[in-house]
Each structure stands twice: as structure tokens, then as C-alpha cells.
Amino acid sequence: MAKNAMLCLLILSVVLALAFATNKKDDEEPENHSTGIFGKVGRVVTVALAMSSRLGGANATRGGGAVYGRNLKSNQLPNNNWMAPPPPMAMRSAKVYDSKHSPAEYLKKFAQDFRRKTGTHSQRHHEETTLEQEKRGAPAGPDPIHHQDTTFEQEKRGAPAGPDPIHHQDTTLEQEKRVAGAGPDPIHHQDTKFEQEKRGAPAGPDPIHH
């Protein structure tokens, strides 16, 4: 870039020197003095810019790429150093672990904390389980309504199995009838007696015949 700037300055200085030299020759023509100076200066500037752009493009194609690449590498080094992550900071837990507690004590403390947390959780779980068991155990025990219905059904079933007063009375009456029929019937007994007397009378001595 510095070389390109120096070339541009040299070209501009040469062009300006030529312009002023030509202006001295044109002093005899005062009408075209102002237009001639500005016109020539403008032409010279445009030509100088065109030449400098061409020279800059040629230098860039020849070796500017390598220079540009070197500049990038040189710029990347400080950027990489600047973007590098900071060194890892020592953790607070590591300090406590190294200074105050040994590995066994640290593990023991961790186990105690874990048991404490899980113990509260297990106690709550045990209380909930006990409550559920009580709820489930209540219907498993004697239900007063169900027990009362069962007792009433058993009484109903037990009543016909025992002596029914009406049925027992009918059975007793039938038994009395059967016993009465089995025993001596007074009417039938009287008829039988009379027939026996009739039969026994001719068998014995007839008082008239006798």
C-alpha cells in the first residue's frame, strides 16, 4: 500500500508540473486561461487515477496476495491470543475437598446427606402407604351394615330350621289324629263289641230253646 501511494504521488507531481508548464505557454490567451487550467488538471487527475489503479491491480495480482496473506497471518496471531479462553478457575468445591475433607470424609458426608433426603421421602411414602392400607383394611374388617344383614339372613335361615310354631302345631294335630285313629275308636269299638255279642249269643245256650 505504501508503494502504491508513493507511485500515485509521483505521478500527480509530474502531471501538475506539466500542467503548470503548459499554463505558462498559454498566458498569451487570457480568455481560455481558466478553462485551460481546470480542464488540464482534471484530465491529468483522471489519467493519474487510472494509471494508479492499473498499477495497484498488477501489484496485487503479482505478489500482493502473498503479502495480504502474510498480513492476515500476522493479524491472526494477536487475535488468537486475544480470543483464547481464560485459564480454568479453581472450583470452590475442589478447594474445600482438598483443604478440609479427605475423600472418605467427603463421601461419608455425601452419603449422610443423601440418606437424610431419601429418609424424609421414604417416611412420607411410608405414611401414605399406611394410610392407603388403613383405607383398604377398613372394608376388609367387619362391616357393621354387611354384618347386620348377614346376621339377619342367618336368623331367617335359622328360624325355618328350628321349630316353626304354626308348622309344629299342624304336625302335632296330624300326629294326634294318627294316634287317635291308631288307638281304639269308641264308635268302631262299640260296633265291634255289639257284633261280638251277636255272634256270641247263638254260640252260647239259648234261653228260650234251653
UniProtKB/Swiss-Prot annotation:
Glycosylation positions in this chain: N32, N59
Residue spans of the A- repeats: 127-135, 148-156, 169-177, 190-198
Keyword check for Signal: yes
Keyword terms, alphabetized: Apoplast, Differentiation, Glycoprotein, Host cytoplasm, Repeat, Secreted, Signal
GO biological process, one term: cell differentiation
Region annotation (Disordered) ranges: 115-210
Record family assignment: Belongs to the CLV3/ESR signal peptide family.
Function recorded in the entry: Mimics host plant CLE extracellular signal peptides that regulate cell fate. May play a role in the differentiation or division of feeding cells (syncytia) induced in plant roots during infection.
Full protein name: CLAVATA3/ESR (CLE)-related protein 4D
